[in-house]
């Protein structure tokens, strides 16, 4: 249900009934594709045969970004083993690569499926901090999960 909801909101799955209406700040209708959004599902998009650095560097939002900036984003999420193959790192470290992708560009809306699963307390606190920082800059989050976190909704829409 939770993953299906996110995928339906993004148009990746067609709903059987009802409609999804996206409105901008002025109340004008838009297609979800007109909003700059990031979707992170269960599959993190991490390539096993690439290094930690290469996994971030190959994303479309890293194009034109200096290596130094990419290293800073990896460092910000606690990854210093940038030359390690992704096949040799833990699930938690793979999720940190995914978190670094959040930092490449400030998206209007982040759709994140189960960001807290398989993480230790340190990584959980890091995600909470990143979400709060990005939210303070005007970014919105739609998050699914099984376990509660230290993040409180600032606005709930039904």
Each language-model region and where it sits:
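Conserved ABC ATPase signature
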Residues: 85-94
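Conserved ABC transporter NBD signature motif
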Residues: 15-35
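Catalytic Walker B motif of ABC-type/P-loop ATPase nucleotide-binding domains
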Residues: 110-114
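Hydrophobic anchor residue at the start of the ABC signature
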Residues: 99
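Helix-to-loop junction immediately C-terminal to a conserved catalytic motif
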Residues: 10
